[in-house]
Amino acid sequence: MGFEWGFKPSSKITQSTVSSQGTGNVMIPTAGVKQKRRYANEEQEEEELPRNKNVMKYGGVSKRRPQPGSLIRGQPLPLQRGMELMNKNQLQQLLVDLMTKHPEIQQSVHTRVIGLDFSIQKCLDMLKQKSEAVYQSIPYNRSYESNKLDDYAFVRMKPQILEFLNCLVDFILDNIPPRLENLHASLKFLDICTELVIKLPRFELASNNYYYDKCIEQLSHVWCTLIEHXARDRIILLADNSSVWKSHMTRLQVYNEHSNGLLERPLQLFKSLDMGSPSAASSSTLSLQESIIYHHDTMTANENNNNSGSAATDSPFN
């Protein structure tokens, strides 16, 4: 007979089993043992199956679900790291908002700011940026070279003009005595600032040029103040090269021509300075002092007129 699948107990096995019982030797059929082990293994696997549901099919790696307490949650940046990523405008706005909500910290912030030493070049770079913003705000349909910009251009350009003039006045006041002891540096900075204002595009209507003219008047007062400081320090006048003072006077004369005579007063003060010998310098002291006194009287009269008149509320020079 050929090979048969499965195991069927034959008569020989039964007979041998019966005969062996008499001798006391018990014989266990091999096929029956294998079946029992197979069934037992299957039952054990079925019992362990619910406990091993999380076993991965590939590689046999356990895929246990992590407990909620072991999850890594995202969190915002620390204050220092966040401020490192903020740009200049965001930092400025943050500081302004804090001072608005908490006015008590304004004095502390102001004390820290005025204690910083800002270079003149940094101030000039900022002024040039704001001056460029004025030119960029000019409408495309009009050219500023003709100095005949209309009312529409004035409305468009007014915010940038006021921002530039306010910044210019603040920087000038921070770079003259007693804030800055170097008189030559103050004069040079004032010279550049005056040039920036003179070159600004003007408007066809005279009333739209009010802010420009008011600014030039204030610059005239600053020029007179610096000339007064130079007149008091005779050592500077005698030790320095006269060409330096003549250069300032020449440039001031050009600015006066472009401003329709608004800088005439400091120009006359410059001309009253004698850069020659000590005797000549002492002879011009009286005339210079008289000019300075007249200058202060003029400033006082102008301030009284401004206080009595109705000046614009958004002007940076009132």
UniProtKB/Swiss-Prot annotation:
Highest taxon of the lineage: Eukaryota
Gene3D superfamilies: Tethering factor for nuclear proteasome Cut8/Sts1 (1.20.58.1590)
Subcellular location: Cytoplasm; Nucleus
Any one GO CC term of the record: cytoplasm
Cleavable signal peptide: none
Molecular function terms, GO-annotated: proteasome binding
InterPro entries, alphabetized: Cut8/Sts1_fam, Cut8/Sts1_sf
Keywords: Cytoplasm, Nucleus, Protein transport, Transport
Cytoplasm in keyword set: yes
Region described as Disordered: spans on this chain: 1-75
GO biological process: one example: proteasome localization
Biased composition (Polar residues): 11-24
Function: Involved in ubiquitin-mediated protein degradation. Regulatory factor in the ubiquitin/proteasome pathway that controls the turnover of proteasome substrates. Targets proteasomes to the nucleus and facilitates the degradation of nuclear proteins.
Record-stated family: Belongs to the cut8/STS1 family.
Quaternary data: Binds the proteasome. Interacts with karyopherin SRP1 and Proteasome subunit RPN11.
Protein name listed in UniProt: Tethering factor for nuclear proteasome STS1
Species: Saccharomyces cerevisiae (strain Lalvin QA23)
